[in-house]
């Protein structure tokens, strides 16, 4: 059930074009709010709706700042009513500063176990839709981050879970199963198989038959592990079903191809801290994917991830 008891939803507010003194929620933020309320219902989690407003220019008065804050709080008030109607315990907060920084600080202060934010804009080109706030959260936030992209299509959704057969990959499988149950989606557990000994085998003049046997054995072992790991989850409770897929190739290419082939709506993937550089993604797999993703994404940090953001 996600294992979430405290959930933080980042609420992006934009000025109402007909009344610039009032704020409203853009479509991607509405999607994030909806996902937050669903997770709150599903996991009986408390939800905090946090809106971060940009500091006013130098010279602005305290009254002007207070007026902007009050407008933001008024825009958030309706979310409390929505949450109450669905039996979700919720609260709202307004902060001033950089969105990604204040969201991470709130996670560090109050121990939120998941962050959900909206994308930049569903109509934006796919390589840009994540936006700078989402990118920084995916890289730096210590808890799982769900970047929700609005989807108007009425079809059964598909969730791809990229499992690298590590502990963080197992966490991704559990989250993917929970998301599939939540969204009534089908699940694809995916592993990009590698052949680490192939270069050595070629160097010692192994025969084509030996190389083929090595590849087949490696794939079979990976498939066995992936099925065993999926069996450790509640995948049988997914109404639309679950399956595994083993594909040879560079992980980011394999994942992107699977997303396109299956028209995936959500990718669940792990990130790994690069040695000595806190907050970076390793192996370029996740970094490459961030530039090409066309679906929503949940990014999971490994145990021991070092968040470079510190509380004052």
Located regions from the model:
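Structural beta-alpha unit
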Residues: 1-3, 54, 63-74, 81-115, ...
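Short, well-ordered secondary-structure micro-motifs
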Residues: 20, 60, 128, 172, ...
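General small-molecule cofactor/ligand-binding pocket signal
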Residues: 48-50, 91-95, 146, 188-190, ...
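Glycine-rich, Arg-bearing micro-motifs that act as flexible, cationic patches
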Residues: 19-20, 117-136, 155-156, 266-292, ...
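Short, structured interface segments
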Residues: 130-151
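Short beta-strand elements of ligand-binding domains
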Residues: 116-119, 144-150, 297-301
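A short acidic, glycine-rich active-site loop
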Residues: 65-74, 208-224
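Small/aliphatic-rich secondary-structure junction motif
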Residues: 2-62, 66, 158-212, 241, ...
């Amino acid at each position: 059930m996600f294992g979430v008891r405290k959930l933080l939803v980042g609420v992006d507010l934009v000025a109402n074009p007909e009344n610039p003194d009032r704020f409203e929620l853009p479509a991607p933020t509405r999607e994030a709010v909806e996902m937050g309320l669903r997770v709150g219902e599903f996991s009986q989690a408390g939800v905090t709706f946090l809106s971060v407003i940009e500091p006013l220019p130098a010279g602005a008065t305290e009254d002007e700042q207070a007026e902007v804050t009050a407008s933001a709080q008024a825009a958030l008030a309706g979310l409390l009513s929505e949450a109450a109607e669905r039996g979700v315990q919720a609260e709202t907060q307004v902060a001033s500063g950089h969105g990604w920084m204040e969201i991470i600080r709130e996670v560090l202060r109050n121990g939120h176990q998941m962050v959900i934010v909206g994308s930049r804009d569903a109509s934006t080109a796919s390589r840009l839709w994540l936006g700078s706030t989402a990118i920084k959260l995916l890289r730096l936030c210590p808890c799982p981050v769900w970047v929700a992209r609005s989807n108007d299509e009425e079809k059964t959704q598909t969730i791809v879970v990229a499992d690298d057969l590590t502990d963080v990959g197992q966490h991704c499988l559990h989250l993917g199963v929970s998301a599939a149950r939540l969204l009534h989606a089908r699940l694809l557990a995916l592993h990009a198989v590698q052949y680490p000994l192939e270069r050595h085998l070629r160097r010692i003049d192994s025969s084509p038959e030996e190389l083929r046997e090595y590849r087949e054995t490696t794939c079979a072992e990976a498939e066995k592990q992936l099925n065993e790991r999926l069996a450790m989850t509640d995948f049988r409770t997914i109404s639309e079903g679950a399956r595994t897929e083993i594909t040879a190739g560079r992980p980011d290419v394999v994942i992107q191809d699977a997303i396109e082939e299956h028209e995936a709506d959500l990718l669940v993937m792990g990130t790994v801290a690069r040695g000595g550089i806190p907050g970076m993604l390793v192996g370029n797999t996740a970094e490459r994917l961030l530039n090409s993703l066309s679906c929503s994404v949940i990014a999971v940090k490994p145990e021991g991830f070092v968040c470079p953001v510190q509380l004052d």
